[in-house]
Amino acid sequence: MTVRKLQQRRGWAFSLGVGIIKPLLLATTVHDWRHGERIPATGGCVLAMNHISHLDPLTAAHIVYDHGRLPRYLAKAGLFENALLRRFLTAAGQIPVEREGRGAVAYAAAVEAVRRGECVVVYPEGTITRDPDMWPMTGKSGAARIGLETGAPVLPVGQWGAQQLLPPYSKKPHLIPRKRVTMSVGEPVALDDLRQRELTPEVVKQATDRILAAITAQVEEIRGAQAPAERYDMRVSGDPYKDRKSA
C-alpha cells in the first residue's frame, strides 16, 4: 500500500527492484508499520535502524518506498565485487562501505547524499546483532557523525520479524506461513545541543548513545519487553556467529 506518492525519479535499478522484490515481500510478509509518516516527505534525512536479518534491508526499503522516498544504504563493499550487482547497486544510488581502511570515503559519500536531499539508511550496529535475544547491541558512529555534520534529522527505526523470515546467517528462508514484519519510526533524535559543540569523540559518542537508545526504545515498544540494561558488545563477549559465517 502506497501511503505517500514518490516524488523522485526511480531510474531503471529501482524500477527493476520494486517490480521483483515488492511482490515477493507482499507474498511472504504481513507488514505492520507504525508512524511511517514521520519519515520526511522531502529533504535529507538519516534513518538509523537495528539489524536482525540479511533480509531486513529489503523489508526496510518497503516502508521507506511506500512513504515516498528512495532509500540509499551504506552497503558492504563486498556486494560491489560482482560486476552485475555493482552496476545495479550503483544505479540505485547505494554507497559502498569498506570494512577496513576506507570508511572515510563512504562517510563523505553519505554526507554528500544527505546534503543532496537523499534519505540515507544506516545500521549503527554495523552488522546483524549478536545479542542472544536480538536486542540492539553496541554501535558505530556513522549515523551520529552524519547527523551532526549535516544537521539533518536522524530518525530511529525499530524493526522486528524479518529474522523469522531469514534467521541470522541462515541460508534457508522460512516463507510459509507469511511472517509479520513490524517497523516503528520514532521522532528525530535530539542532537541540536551537540551540534553546537566541537565534533570531538566524546560528542560523537553521546550522539551515538542517544541514537541507539532511541532505536532500542522503538524495539521495546514493538516487542512489549524491556531490553537488557547493558548492551551486547562483541569486543567483550565475542562473536557467536563466527563459525556459522565461515561454514
Predicted segments, located by residue:
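A cross-family acyltransferase "interaction/gating" segment
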Residues: 133-202, 232-238, 242-246
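Short, flexible loop/turn segments with low-complexity composition
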Residues: 221-236
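Catalytic-site beta-strand/loop segments enriched in glycine and acidic/polar residues
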Residues: 113-143
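Hydrophobic/aromatic ligand-binding patch that stacks against planar heteroaromatic rings
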Residues: 88, 112, 145-149
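A transmembrane-helix-recognition feature enriched in membrane-embedded lipid enzymes
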Residues: 2-41, 59, 83-92
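Catalytic core of membrane glycerolipid acyltransferases/transacylases, capturing the structured
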Residues: 40-101
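A charged, well-structured terminal subsegment
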Residues: 108-113, 181-217, 221
